[in-house]
Design a protein with these regions (language model features):
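Sec-dependent bacterial lipoprotein signal peptides
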Residues: 1-16
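Acidic, polar-rich low-complexity tracts and alpha-helical solenoid repeat scaffolds
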Residues: 12-270
Length: 270
């Protein structure tokens, strides 16, 4: 084990000596050749150092575009996504009509995707990725990358849905029933293709019911009426749902509460 560590250390020192020797060489064309070799061998740190060193010399020359393109990828391949995004952006600004522009445009969006965190964390990068991938699809309607871009959008939207659903459930668990009802209804509006639409609607009904139960007497008629409206909307929107029976129970209980507080027959559920 100790011998292996020594070998690794000696190899690292030799590599450092090699790159330092190249960097000290006054010939930028030689440095570029070495950068290309390091790039081909996926030695991203060394390639990055050399590309950065020779860029001032090759600026304005035909080689510069490829240098900058690969320089951006050295950052990406080191998982320095923040820097890579900025480099891809600059490449597109300098070479908007390049044959590589479509690829780089995709990769710029992809850097935000790679920075997308777990669902419980801030989703700013997820939102940026969604927006940029959608722009990519619109800008490059015939791209072979559009299928992948669409799949990533779906993946990120599913993550956003999980985050929003957890937030709505937290409102409910904390007894903030009005906020929970609004949040569950917002899920239906923001994620119309969700597979959990009837579940969200049921949770909205439960939230409105609990909110009505805890209301002062002067507000109960209005708020139990709201529960009945939500129940009717559920039946209209999800006629085949397996949750209908539970919804009907909330509707019946709310009608009984209306009778109790108004002393008159409640409206029949449609």
């Amino acid at each position: 084990m100790k011998f292996s560590a020594i070998i690794i250390l000696l190899f690292a020192l030799a590599s450092c000596k090699g790159i330092n020797s190249v960097l000290k060489n006054p010939d930028p064309k030689y440095k570029l050749r070495m950068a290309e070799q390091y790039y081909a061998k996926k030695k991203w740190v060394y390639a990055q150092q050399l590309y950065e060193d020779v860029m001032p010399f090759f600026r304005g020359q035909p080689e510069f575009e490829d240098i900058y393109y690969k320089y951006a990828y050295t950052a990406y391949n080191q998982k320095d996504y923040l820097n890579a995004e900025n480099l891809f952006k600059t490449y597109l600004e300098i070479y908007p009509n390049s044959p590589k522009a479509e690829e780089v445009d995709f990769m710029r969006a992809y850097t935000f995707y790679k920075q997308s965190p777990k669902a419980e964390l801030d989703q700013t990068n997820s939102l940026k990725a969604i927006g940029m991938f959608q722009t990519f699809i619109n800008t490059h309607p015939g791209s072979a990358k559009n299928k992948e871009a669409g799949a990533i959008i779906d993946e990120l939207r599913a993550k956003l849905e999980v985050k929003d659903a957890r937030a709505a459930q937290l409102y409910y668990d904390l007894g903030q029933f009005r906020a929970a009802a609004v949040a569950f209804n917002a899920l239906l509006e923001n994620y119309p293709d969700t597979q959990k639409a009837d579940e969200y609607k049921l949770m909205s009904i439960k939230s409105y019911y609990q909110f009505a139960e805890l209301s002062i007497e002067e507000k109960k008629v209005e708020r139990f009426g709201k529960v009945i409206e939500e129940c009717n909307d559920f039946v209209d929107r999800f006629p085949q749902s397996g949750l209908t029976k539970e919804v009907e129970q909330y509707s019946t209980q709310s009608q009984n509460n209306l009778k109790r507080y108004t002393n008159e027959p409640a409206k029949t559920t449609t």
